[in-house]
From Swiss-Prot:
InterPro entries: Integrase-like_N, TACO1_YebC-like_2nd/3rd_dom, TACO1_YebC_N, Transcrip_reg_TACO1-like, Transcrip_reg_TACO1-like_dom3, YebC-like
Keywords: Cytoplasm, DNA-binding, Transcription, Transcription regulation
Domain of life where this protein originates: Bacteria
HAMAP family: Transcrip_reg_TACO1
Name of the protein in question: Probable transcriptional regulatory protein GM21_0933
Pfam short name (any one): Transcrip_reg
Signal sequence, start to end: none
GO terms under cellular component: cytosol
Length: 247
């Protein structure tokens, strides 16, 4: 299983997605608001906003919520001002961790993030300490029910970097600048992605087991549970056998 998708697979198995639906909505609304503020309220001219709206649709978020968030972003409604930043650190077993946050109180957030690192046998690092271990990429995930050869051909023709056959899905990787072009071309060819996002892909993976594996999952869970954290990325790998011991 590819490491960059390990956490989403684990969450699915733990059945955590539905329980945290409210938090997912909150994070998407924040992203839509900030994207609209920075790049305007027209998704056709604002790729970041388009991606956030697509994510909202994928989570079946009511249209009213999306429109309200856009209005708030462009100044049509009163709302909180958010600041974006990324914290970096080391998780259990020497794993590299990136934490993307959107906050209205940086002091509160940095304290919370540092505390989660410490309590889960990790430590917060300086800016730049682990970001070089990740590549920013567009990632589109497709079900195994579609024809791989046709998907591969259409993806490469549209400008994708790579198409891989993973355990439970097909993955299309793109340069961030080509993400929307590839996504639109594949949709036009009849390929509907199960998920599509700009993400951080680790260059190498660190295998974890035992207490380190437990603490890593705890760290990921607690980071995602924090209202200020938008995304968390880490280069850990946990085997299926190890996962079964912990479930």
């Amino acid at each position: 299983m590819s490491g960059h998708n390990k956490w989403s697979t684990i969450k699915h198995k733990k059945g955590a997605a539905d329980a945290k639906r409210g938090k997912i909505f909150t994070k998407i609304i924040k992203e839509i608001t900030v994207a609209a503020k920075l790049g305007g309220g027209d998704p056709d001219g604002n790729p970041r906003l388009r991606t956030a709206i697509d994510k909202a649709k994928g989570e079946n978020m009511p249209k009213d919520n999306v429109e309200r968030a856009i209005k708030k972003g462009v100044g049509g409604l009163e709302g909180t001002t958010y600041e974006e930043t990324t914290y970096e650190g080391y998780g259990p077993g020497g794993t590299a961790v990136l934490v993307e946050v959107m906050t209205d109180n940086r002091n509160r957030t940095v304290s919370d993030v540092r505390s989660i690192f410490t309590k889960c046998n990790g430590n917060m690092g300086e800016s730049g300490c682990v970001s070089w271990l990740f590549d920013k990429k567009g990632l589109l995930v497709f079900p195994k029910s579609i024809d791989f050869d046709k998907l591969f051909e259409a993806s490469i023709e549209a400008g994708a970097d790579d198409v891989t056959d993973e355990d439970e899905q097909y993955e299309v990787l793109t340069d961030p600048s080509a993400f929307h072009q590839v996504k639109t071309a594949l949709e036009g060819a009849g390929f509907k992605a199960e998920s599509a996002e700009i993400t951080m892909i680790p260059q190498t993976m660190v295998k974890l087991e035992g207490k380190n594996a437990e603490n890593m999952l705890k760290l990921m869970d607690r980071m995602e549970d924090n209202d200020d954290v938008q995304n968390v990325y880490a280069n850990f790998d946990i085997s299926e056998e190890e996962m079964e011991k912990m479930m």
